[in-house]
Amino acid sequence: MKDQLLVPLRRRPWTCQKCLQRLQLPRHQTRRSFETAASPFPRPLDSLPADYARTKTVDDDTLRRVFDSQQFWREFSQQRAAQPKPTGLVQNQYLTSPDGFRTFANVSLQKCQAIVSKVLAASTLEEYRTMARDLDRLSDLLCRVIDLSDFIRVIHPDPQVQEAATQAYALMFEYMNVLNTTTGLNDQLKKAAANPEVTSQWSDEEKIVAQILIKDFSNSAIHMPPHERQRFVNLSNDISQLGSSFVNGAEPAKSHVSVATNNLRGLDPILVQQIKRWNRTAAVPTTGMIPRLALRSVHDENVRREVYLASRTSSKRQLHRLEELLLKRAELAKLSGYESFAHMTLSDKMAKSPEAVSNFLTALVESNRKLVREELSQLQVMKGAPLQPWDHAYYVHQRVLQYSQARRSRELSAVPEFFSLGTVMQGLSRLFDRLYGVRLVPQEPAPGETWNPDVRRLDVVDEAGRHIAVIYCDLFSRPNKHPNPAHFTLRCSREISAEEVAECASLDQSSHPNDGMATAVDPVTQTLRQLPTIALVCDFPEPGTNGGGRPSLLSEHSVRTLFHEMGHAVHSILGQTRLQSISGTRCATDFAELPSVLMEHFATVPSVLALYARHWRTDEPLSEGMIRSMERDRTAHGSIYGAVENEAQILMALVDQAYHSRPADGGRIDSTALYQQVSQQHSSLPEPADATTPPTSWQGFFGHLYGYGATYYSYIFDRAIANKLWVDVFGAGRHAVDRAAGERYKNEVLRWGGGRSGWECVAGALGSANESNADGRLVEGGDQAMREVGRWGLGRDGVSG
């Protein structure tokens, strides 16, 4: 975390870990209502508006048009323009003006303080029995302000709103820091969790949330004596500052290499002119796009070697930052009673230990090695001599050019014509309807509800017409907008107790138990629920402005990106737990990417393409010939470099583990020696190790060592699991639109959020008859389970994103 308010702690008890890692982008929300006889409110909390009676066919057509036609969107979005009273941002009743952020934060703060007083004063069995739920509500109240303010302060175009959101964010983080040092909360929760008369009355969710909070308190040093706690805070501050400096301070040892211009043959002449100097030499920079292009295109191997070595050698200052960061993390782990930082970080993950991660990565290296050798042997034939690391990009580029000239179908250039943004969103809705019985319904935003006129609002409804979630889609590019695609949960699902409803009604007739945002009544329990509210942010080109204008057309890569982000969204939508601390994507870090990675597999299989891939002008479906051409193209590119890309990701995960698994009392670290050791031991194209070549130190450019310290393996771990589920549950695409397969995946994985072990989810989805899970051996996880996942491999698709 970069924000100074976060520096005292590695992970806060009162906010979702995902939220704390996302200081750079937004998330979103809505509301609805069913009228109930017992409702104390002057307006219904969950009545669906009349326009929900629109047929699925009309909704489906509207979904495509709101994204593909600016004129249609303008008309559609103005239907509530005459509403006399503006709605707050994302329907939050407080956020009708910048000043509303202060009110929102203060009201939430008062509710938090009341809960803290209640927990600290608890003395009876009944009071202890409500403690897990009380503390979950405390977490929810903090996240309500923090998540939304964090999003708005980055995404909103108005500086006044940005500043107001920043102040609300700061206020709640400051209060959260107070909670983190309130030892009575930890003492009371541990007392409750240790009493069988209390825990016997807790649901499984309450038990899980209590254990999560106890561990979070422990990781925040609340149990330590004052002097050790202060040391913990100081170390956390140091780590935050060093981490920020490391991420932002990446720099090479040399800013450029001097090369004779006539040795740059193959590089674009325009680029050569840009870097040319007066004395027939060129200064090739060692960072940015030019060195990457040089490695791909310069014919002279000696030049490629020089550029490769210089662009992978970090400055001494940057290496010092990294090694200080690793040292402080090791000291923090020792202070917390752990063998290493990796042991501390992994204790609540699926992996559990660095030894298990090592088992997974080692098995993965072996399962991938044959494919790597096949790829490299083809490149070595092209070179006619032993392949070196600086040769790989060059000969891959040559092979791709050969393939493109000889076999690549010209019709592939027309594929984006069949992927308008509207048709892709339509396809996602149809896919979700077939797999899970939920669909996306465009909804006219109320005045003041969105932060930009281009933001589309979608309501998610089930087959009974019940409203279950809200998605705000901010998908088009605009000046100063963050370009990276992302999913944000602005408000998690959660059950709202009758006591909260009564408390809210007693405060103010206009007050709402979910701040005016989306609610619904659970048809089974008849309890009120706050619905997940999500924001999807992308950077696609805007559609044409006139009525017949060209829509935003997506590349195959962009389609996969959108499917990936919607994989996170569907986890939030379907993972509706009673407690917010474990809802949706609030699960173990090494499980969180599974739904999104699995969704990528659906994007281009024929049965799913048949749901949406139609020409934006003629409505002609994508032909079987074009689909086969796409498949051949993916297979060809995967066979050229997919396995080597996978190996590169595995090596980065191994380096991460090597750095963070060192014993806490292991003294100073030589990060370059460890990096070289991993490369020599596991790489098929290891870094040069001869005495005449100074060792490279690419680790100084590996910024994820800070944000994903000891957990960089997570993405490829989830890729391996996703590949397995794709084959064994969805039949490698044969059952991609099959309801039985969708229900199985939903019931075993998605609906649990973080309320079930990831291993139980995977084992449940595979079933006990699956050879990999014979006798349910995956359920408990452990070293052997991690090794088994490593044997599943990554295929040849390469790493997307």
From Swiss-Prot:
GO terms for molecular function: metal ion binding; metalloendopeptidase activity. Pfam families: Peptidase_M3 (PF01432). One of its GO terms (cellular component) is mitochondrial matrix. It catalyses: Release of an N-terminal octapeptide as second stage of processing of some proteins imported into the mitochondrion. Residues 1-41 form a transit peptide. Keywords: Hydrolase, Metal-binding, Metalloprotease, Mitochondrion, Protease, Transit peptide, Zinc. This is Mitochondrial intermediate peptidase. It comes from Aspergillus fumigatus (strain ATCC MYA-4609 / CBS 101355 / FGSC A1100 / Af293). The gene is oct1.
